[in-house]
């Protein structure tokens, strides 16, 4: 079975094509903390867009915010029940087949 709408670059886009999918994909693929600026650079989104999404995800407790020497870092909350699912979606790779194309 083929799923042409599922992107290997960002499988979350099939659920949400917006900034949320970009942020979740970055956080789901990385064990380290990222700043809003770093995520914005990696996704070609504005820092303010990314920051708004991160604030909402922190409120839901899916994402943790860590402050170190004036620098805010964000990462998935390992205790949240959706974290492993977010990681699994972020790591998803669809095998592309030319069969039947």
What are these regions (language model features)?
Residues 38-42:
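A short acidic, leucine-rich amphipathic alpha-helix
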Residues 1-22:
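Short alpha-helical segments that sit at the start of domains
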Residues 77-101:
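Conserved segment of winged-helix/HTH DNA-binding domains
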Residues 45-58:
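Short amphipathic alpha-helical interaction segments
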Residues 14, 27-31:
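Short helix-capping/hinge SLiMs at alpha-helix to coil transitions
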Residues 58-68:
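A short, conserved structural fragment
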Residues 67-73, 77-79:
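Short, Lys/Arg-rich nucleic-acid/phosphate-binding segment
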